[in-house]
């Protein structure tokens, strides 16, 4: 079973749109929750979870930051080498937990970061997202795509060794937009960062790449 927890992401409902655009054979394996942390907090989902997908930034969208029940379940999942797909800014899903801040590979840094790291930024511009020359297995499957003007999440903190799978250029500088890393317990983390507005998360190639990442991680 895939568990997919999302917020409304400032009323864009990006996570919900991504879920709805999954191929039917994947969608039927997903339990999706938007703006509802009850199951995440209750914790029993962890025993059934084959893949954890997040489109969530803790403490935003009028939701509380997930608490101790969620923390225990997420850590148990990670400790049994669970894989994760972190969409958009979800490296900050649980940014108040110190151990979480250290395991996501790259990290969207919130204002007033507990570690004192300078906040990440999101300039708005059209962008071309390009697959890297990398021997990671996913790079042989991913495809390039172009997005209209949208927030581009950049200036992330690197918290562990990563393979960069996709990048985009902003003002002459190249930034990661998809990365692979591993938790201390051996689970793989794919950060897939592009996509905010509805017209961007409805992009066919973006959705195809997300579906490829899901299949790879299962």
Locations of regions flagged by a protein language model:
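A glycine-rich, often tryptophan-bearing local segment used as a flexible ligand/cofactor-contacting loop or short
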Residues: 62-137
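Short hydrophobic segments within beta-strands
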Residues: 4-6, 87, 192
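Extracellular ligand-binding/catalytic regions of CAZymes and related secreted enzymes
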Residues: 184-218
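Structural motif
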Residues: 51-55, 189-191
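Alpha-helical scaffolding within the catalytic cores
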Residues: 36-41, 69-72, 173-178
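Aromatic-Pro/Gly-enriched surface loop or interdomain linker
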Residues: 1-51
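Catalytic beta-strand/loop cores that center a nucleophilic Ser/Cys/Thr
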Residues: 25-29, 48, 116-186
């Amino acid at each position: 079973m895939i568990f997919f927890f999302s917020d409304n992401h400032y009323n864009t409902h990006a996570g919900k749109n991504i879920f709805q655009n999954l191929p039917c054979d994947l969608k039927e394996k997903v339990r999706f929750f938007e703006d509802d942390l009850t199951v995440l907090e209750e914790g029993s989902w962890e025993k059934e979870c084959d893949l954890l997908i997040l489109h969530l930034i803790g403490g935003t969208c009028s939701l509380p930051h997930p608490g101790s029940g969620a923390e225990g379940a997420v850590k148990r999942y990670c400790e049994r080498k669970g894989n994760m797909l972190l969409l958009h800014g979800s490296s900050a899903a649980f940014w108040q937990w110190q151990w979480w801040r250290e395991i996501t590979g790259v990290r969207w840094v919130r204002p007033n970061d507990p570690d004192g790291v300078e906040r990440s930024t999101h300039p708005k511009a059209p962008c071309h997202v390009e697959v890297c020359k990398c021997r990671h297995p996913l790079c042989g499957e991913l495809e390039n795509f172009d997005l209209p003007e949208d927030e581009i999440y950049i200036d992330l903190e690197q918290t562990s060794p990563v393979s960069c799978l996709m990048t985009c250029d902003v003002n002459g500088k190249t930034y990661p937009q998809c990365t692979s890393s591993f938790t201390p317990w051996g689970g793989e983390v794919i950060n897939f960062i592009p996509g905010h507005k509805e017209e961007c998360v409805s992009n066919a190639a973006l959705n195809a790449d997300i579906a490829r990442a899901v299949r790879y991680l299962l």
